[in-house]
Amino acid sequence: MIKIYVMESCPDCTEVKALYSNHPEYELIDIGRQARSLKEFLALRDHHPAFEKVRQRGNIGIPCFVREDGSIAISLKHFDAGRFIEGTPAIQEGAS
């Protein structure tokens, strides 16, 4: 399953949510709905090499696609092109 981190108020996430909201192989996680989801995403963003430029620019880094092996694509364009950046394993459910 691929986790997709999005946020309701994010204009870049609108198309992603429309495309993947009803597909069982994808888990859409709205980081604005629960503190636990936000903490999970921030832990990933603060430590994964895929977010280096995102952090430098002061951006958030969503939408974000995370495969089970921990590799990440930070845009729909990169996801569609299969451009994932390897890194640390995926953050486990409930990790802080």
Segments the model singles out, each with a brief description of its role:
Residues M1-I31:
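Local sequence-structure signature of Cys/Sec-based thiol-disulfide redox active-site neighborhoods
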Residues V16, S37-E40, S75:
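Amphipathic alpha-helical interface surfaces
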Residues A18-Y20, A43, F79-D80:
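Short, glycine/charged-enriched secondary-structure capping and boundary segments
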Residues E25-H48:
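Thiol-based oxidoreductase modules, predominantly thioredoxin-like and allied folds used
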Residues H48-V54:
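A polyampholytic, Gly/Pro-enriched intrinsically disordered region
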Residues V54-G61:
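Thiol/disulfide oxidoreductase modules built on the thioredoxin-like
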Residues G61-A73:
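A short, hydrophobic beta-strand/beta-hairpin element that forms part of a small beta-sheet core
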Residues G70-A95:
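C-terminal cap of thioredoxin/glutaredoxin-like
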